[in-house]
Structures are given as structure tokens and as C-alpha cells.
Swiss-Prot record:
Organism: Oryza sativa subsp. japonica
Residues binding Zn(2+): 259, 261, 346
Protein's gene: HDAC10
Protein name: Histone deacetylase 10, chloroplastic
SUPFAM superfamilies membership: Arginase/deacetylase
Subcellular location(s) per record: Plastid, Chloroplast; Mitochondrion
Reactions accelerated catalytically: N-acetylserotonin + H2O = serotonin + acetate; N-acetyltyramine + H2O = tyramine + acetate; N-acetyltryptamine + H2O = tryptamine + acetate; melatonin + H2O = 5-methoxytryptamine + acetate
One CC-aspect GO term: chloroplast
Enzyme class: hydrolase
EC numbers, comma separated: 3.5.1.-
A molecular-function term among this protein's GO annotations: histone deacetylase activity
Length: 443
């Protein structure tokens, strides 16, 4: 199978959108949406559910960006006021490779768990809203973070992927593409943008806006400005951060990344930016080998990158200490206008790709504490973005418990976590790492 380095490719000239419209049987006047491009996946379930449709022609709540452009959200004010959770799903069913850990089964597994644990609108009414038919991100949105040469190169690569079935787009790395990858990645980025729009609109209606969760794939936090990396194609959270700044005037954005791997792409995008605070906890020495504790940003951005690499075996104790002593104080000092979260669930003890030992309860704690910090500092404006998590059981139970934290309900971690799978955490090394981060950042 031929390997392809995408950023070196020439411009395609927009062939992918007509091709996909033809493939889906839509005329060029139809908006491209998640459902119109879904190749296979879960069936639509109404059953009395609240389902919010985000189409420009639909009448509903609207917001104005910093350029005065109005955007219809199709979310009546009463729904925004009542909602505790807004979420979008973009499972990217066509973006798949057999035996690859980043599989198209990930998002459906989460959705199934939410349904079984009665955390969907079918069971919760307007407390939990799934926004469907959201629009893909525009190429200009993606270009807020990624180079034009990469974007157009990837678009061109779709014709090769159509011929070959699957291509590799990261040189010798693990990131692949199929013929639907480009458009599905635009949809995943669009999910995050839609949730930012909706959470911001809700925050203008009352003091307790819903939290957002973009249940999307492929993940994004490894994608660098010039290309793909580590299963990631576009930096979903980075695009949303720039969008929040440019379209909503939310100047100060805090990004918390608790994936087991360092979010090097997000870090690179904002390493010199004083208005975006990037904070990553990750396993020391894990892929991609970046995120050293002394890397704190540079130029005007010095001090707005905080890396906290944790020793292998770190778990609930480590993250509780990290949150109390590093994450919360850093947020309180930075005073963000919105908090975005790279929610990777591959730090779970059952995950096959790394060596931390978080539990379902750890992720519940993180979600609950981040919710509290967002309420205290930025009017509750907070959106989570799915990153890693490759054991479908631990991934789905942990995301479900995240939803319970958003709702302010007790954790069900005891149903999923087996204490026998855990071993003693390296407390001395954990303390050394936390103390060093506190010293470097004067916390």
C-alpha cells in the first residue's frame, strides 16, 4: 500500500465536495451534514426524544459573531435554559482500518452506553440534548490552525484514497485516510464549533449554561499545523479555540488535556500565544515524547503552556493532587473566558496503549471539578472533545460517568471499577513532578 505525505500535495480545486454530494445522492443545493454523509451507523431514534437540528433555514435561537453575522442555532431559548448537557456525535464510520485501535466502533460504543445507562434525551427529556445535522467546519475554520497547503493536500488525497481504498498520510506513522476522511473530519471539527456556539448562546440566557461534549473521531490533539499525526487529522479543539476567540470575542481560552499522551499538536499551535493557556497531564515518556515539564511556552506565550508528565502507574491519587494543586490554581490565575477540554480516556487502567491507572471514578472527578471551575471562572462555558480511549468498555463507561458528573448525579464507578486491577501508585515520583510544576509556574 503506497504511503503518502500529504502536505507536499498540490491543490485539488474543490473536487471532494461535488464527489461526496454525488455519492450521497444530494444536489449541490443541499447542506452537507453529519447525517447526509453518514455511510453506516446507528439508526435515528426519536421515541419522544429532544433532538436539536442545527440548519440555517430553521427558526430558533440565533447568535451574532464579532463580525455581526447572525447564525441560527435551531435551539429554542427554553431548551437552552433547561439543558444540562449538549452533545454532538460524529462517528466517522467511513474512516476505518481493520485491526487499528482508533476504530469506528468507538463513538457507537459510547452512544450505546449512554442509552443503556439512561443518559440520553429519551430518558432525560430536555436535560440532555443531542444536536444533529450540524454543519461541517469550513476550510477557513480549519485554516485558523492548519496550513492551507496541508488542507488542500489532504483534500486531493481523497481521490487517491478512493482508488486505493486506504492510504497512509503520515509518512511511516499510524495515521491513515479513506475516501471519506476529509469530509468526516470537517464534520467532527464542525461539531465542536456548533457546541461552542450553543454553549455561548446559552450562557447569555442564564448563569448555568449546559456543558458541551463533542463525541467525535478521529481525535485531534496530535495533529500539528502542518500535517496529521498520531491518529489525528485536524485539531478539533484547536480550531474551536480560535473560533471562540474570533467569532465570539472570548479572548482568553483555557485548554485542559488529560489524555494519556501529550497533545503536541495543540501545544504547538499555541506555544507563543499569551491568550490560550494549554495545560496537559500525560504519562512521562509516552508517545510522542513531547510535553517536557520545562516546556512552558515561548515569546509572548511564555508561561501559558503547562506540561505535567506523570510517572507510569499514576492514577486517582495523582490526578486529585494535580487538580487541587496545579490545574485549579492555574485556571484561577489565568481567568479564562471559556474552558475547552481534550478528554482522552486512554489513561484508564484497562486501556492497552499506555501505562497509567485512572479509573471511571477518576474521570468522574475530573469532569465534576472542571464543571465547578468553569462555573466559578467563566460563566459555566465549557466544552469537552473526545480524544483517545481504545478499550471500548472503559471508554464508554467513563464517558457515561462524565455525563453523570455534568448532571450533578452520583458516580456509578463502583459498577465498573475493580480495585483488584490497581497497584500502588508511585507517590514519591508523583509528588516530585507536581512540586516541580508548581515551582516552575509559581503556583
Amino acid at each position: 500500500m503506497e504511503q503518502l505525505w500529504v502536505p507536499s500535495l498540490p491543490i485539488l480545486g474543490g473536487r471532494i465536495l461535488p464527489m461526496l454530494r454525488h455519492y450521497c445522492g444530494f444536489g449541490s443545493h443541499h447542506p452537507l451534514t453529519w447525517r447526509s454523509l453518514q455511510i453506516t451507523g446507528r439508526k435515528q431514534k426519536h421515541n419522544g426524544c429532544w433532538i436539536a437540528y442545527c440548519l440555517p433555514s430553521h427558526n430558533g435561537t440565533s447568535i451574532s459573531d464579532t463580525n455581526g453575522v447572525r447564525k441560527d442555532l435551531a435551539l429554542p431559548d427554553n431548551l437552552l435554559r433547561d439543558a444540562h448537557i449538549l452533545y454532538c456525535t460524529s462517528p466517522a464510520m467511513g474512516h476505518n482500518k481493520e485491526a487499528h485501535p482508533e476504530t469506528n466502533k468507538r463513538v457507537p460504543a459510547i452512544v450505546d452506553a449512554l442509552e443503556k445507562l439512561e443518559l440520553t434525551s429519551k430518558h432525560r427529556g430536555s436535560q440532555v440534548l443531542e444536536i444533529q445535522d450540524f454543519q461541517p467546519a469550513s476550510l477557513d475554520d480549519i485554516a485558523l490552525v492548519h496550513s492551507r497547503s496541508y488542507i488542500t493536500g489532504l483534500e486531493k488525497a481523497m481521490s487517491r484514497a478512493s482508488d486505493e481504498g486506504l492510504i497512509f498520510i503520515e509518512g511511516t506513522g499510524p495515521t491513515y485516510a479513506t475516501q471519506t476522511t476529509f469530509q468526516e473530519c470537517l464534520l467532527s471539527a464542525g461539531a465542536g464549533i456548533t457546541l461552542v456556539d450553543s454553549v455561548v448562546a446559552a450562557s447569555k440566557l442564564g448563569p448555568k449554561p449546559p456543558l458541551g461534549f463533542a463525541l467525535v473521531r478521529p481525535p485531534g490533539h496530535h495533529a500539528v499545523p502542518e500535517g496529521p499525526m498520531g491518529f489525528c487529522v485536524f485539531g478539533n479543539i484547536a480550531v474551536a479555540a480560535r473560533y471562540a476567540q474570533n467569532q465570539h470575542g472570548l479572548k482568553r481560552v483555557m485548554i485542559i488535556d488529560f489524555d494519556v499522551h501529550h497533545g503536541n499538536g495543540t501545544c504547538d499551535a499555541f506555544y507563543e500565544d499569551p491568550d490560550i493557556f494549554f495545560l496537559s497531564t500525560h504519562q512521562l515518556g509516552s508517545y510522542p515524547g513531547t510535553g517536557k515539564i520545562h516546556q512552558v511556552g515561548q515569546g509572548n506565550g511564555e508561561g501559558t503552556t503547562l506540561n505535567l508528565p506523570l510517572p507510569g502507574g499514576s492514577g486517582d491519587y495523582a490526578m486529585r493532587c494535580a487538580f487541587d494543586e496545579v490545574i485549579a490554581p492555574a485556571a484561577q490565575r489565568f481567568k479564562p473566558d471559556i474552558i475547552l477540554v481534550s478528554a482522552g480516556y486512554d489513561a484508564h487502567a484497562l486501556d492497552p496503549l499506555a501505562g497509567l491507572q485512572f479509573t471511571t471514578g477518576t474521570f468522574y472527578m475530573l469532569a465534576a471539578r472542571i464543571r465547578e471551575v468553569a462555573a466559578e471562572l467563566c460563566g459555566g462555558r465549557c466544552v469537552f472533545f473526545l480524544e483517545g480511549g481504545y478499550n471500548l468498555e472503559s471508554l464508554s463507561s467513563s464517558v457515561a460517568d462524565t455525563f453523570r458528573a455534568f448532571l450533578g448525579e452520583p458516580s456509578l464507578a463502583a459498577r465498573f471499577d475493580d480495585p483488584a486491577m490497581l497497584y500502588e501508585e508511585p507517590t514519591r515520583k508523583i509528588r516530585e513532578a507536581i512540586d516541580k510544576a508548581k515551582h516552575l509556574h509559581s503556583l
